[in-house]
Design a protein with these regions (language model features):
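Long, charge-rich, low-complexity alpha-helical segments
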Residues: 1-128, 184, 189-249
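Short connector loops at helix/strand junctions that flank enzyme active sites
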Residues: 78, 136-138, 173
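A general structural signal for short secondary-structure junctions and capping/turn motifs
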Residues: 101-102, 132-136, 168-170, 225
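Surface-exposed beta-loop interaction hotspot
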Residues: 119-140, 146
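Low-complexity, glycine/alanine/valine/leucine- and proline-rich hydrophobic stretches
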Residues: 140-204
């Protein structure tokens, strides 16, 4: 006897499987609608990627992805996070080494735009903070370390600026970015490597004092002030002091 979970898995597999002559007509229509909606979801979440590789190519990869990794959540705004990694493993990535990073930037922007509206942390809150605490990352925050040319390509493709796109030279140096929407407007900000490491450490939930050791005492106050001004955090939570797993030498 099938459990409810088994029945749900079987129904999901039937919806996403390739149609055959044995497929009931009603299910075939529903299946095509489901797959079409999931493919459309990916197109909306990855606009620059879509324009970069073209409608037909994107559609082919999106359909493969839908079959390989169907959604696990009813909220389709959450569907597609694994798509950049899927593209990175594709043959197309060998021809377009920046492709996956363009897709990651698409996803980070999509995430920021659909995150819950949340005010950023007021720096004055720190005056009354407990002795040891960690920051709560802003819901819209996404941290990315991309190829530098990927960011330029992403912008040029969305602006449909062919001249600008043609002038972009290959550049695989790293651009550490934060993507967020703390005050209603989308922001894409490049950080120094040290600032990015600090942001990543704090966003991961490490207490403030050991996290500041990553960047050094001289720059710590200024760096923290900048991160707060950017709106990276939405709150703080008390936390016991703990050591970083890989303390700086």
């Amino acid at each position: 006897m099938y459990s409810l979970r088994d029945r749900q898995k079987k129904f999901q597999a039937a919806l996403l499987a390739i149609s055959t002559n044995e497929t009931p007509n009603g299910l075939a229509v529903y299946r095509n609608n489901v797959r079409g909606n999931l493919t459309l979801t990916l197109k909306l979440a990855f606009p620059a990627t879509l324009k970069l590789i073209g409608e037909d190519c994107f559609h082919a990869y999106a359909e493969q992805f839908v079959l390989a990794q169907p959604p696990r959540n009813a909220d389709l705004h959450l569907y597609g996070e694994a798509f950049p990694a899927y593209l990175a493993a594709s043959a197309l990535a060998g021809q377009l080494p920046y492709l996956a990073d363009v897709a990651w930037l698409d996803w980070a922007v999509h995430h920021a735009l659909h995150a819950a509206e949340t005010p950023p942390l007021d720096p004055q809150t720190l005056a009354h903070a407990p002795e040891s605490f960690s920051f709560i990352g802003h819901p819209s925050l996404w941290l990315l370390a991309l190829r530098r040319d990927a960011q330029a390509i992403w912008a040029a493709v969305l602006e449909e600026d062919d001249n600008r796109l043609a002038g972009i030279l290959p550049d695989d140096s790293v651009a550490p970015l934060i993507i967020l929407r703390p005050r209603g407007s989308l922001e894409i900000i490049e950080l120094s490597p040290a600032m990015f490491d600090l942001a990543l450490t704090l966003e991961s939930g490490f207490p403030l004092d050991p996290a500041l050791a990553v960047i050094g005492e001289e720059e710590a106050a200024q760096a923290l002030g900048l991160l707060l001004s950017y709106g990276l955090f939405s709150g703080i939570t008390p936390k016991a002091t703990e050591e970083l797993p890989c303390p700086p030498r």
